Amino acid sequence: MFTLKKSMLLLFFLGTISLSLCEEERNADEDDGEKEVKRGIFALIKTAAKFVGKNLLRQAGKAGLEHLACKANNQC
């Protein structure tokens, strides 16, 4: 009975160690994945901001030129 308890305790101990090592490795893999996702989201936001900024400036430029042309021709 005593040797059975020792064997079971040893198996439990080894199983706990291997489980903790697997969890550490999995957590390390998950951390790397989060960094990649964050980079991907940042790049997407950056690209969208550039696109919106260019379009807004282009529209503002057109509106400004139309307004100046209107004032120059006294058609406003």
Swiss-Prot record:
Keyword terms: Amphibian defense peptide, Antimicrobial, Cleavage on pair of basic residues, Disulfide bond, Secreted, Signal
Tissue occurrence: Expressed by the skin glands.
Record-annotated disulphide pairs: 70-76
GO cellular component assignments: extracellular region
Propeptide residue intervals: 23-37
Key word Signal present: yes
One Pfam family per UniProt: FSAP_sig_propep
Protein family: Belongs to the frog skin active peptide (FSAP) family. Esculentin subfamily.
Protein name: Esculentin-2MT3
Organism listed in the record: Amolops mantzorum (Sichuan torrent frog)
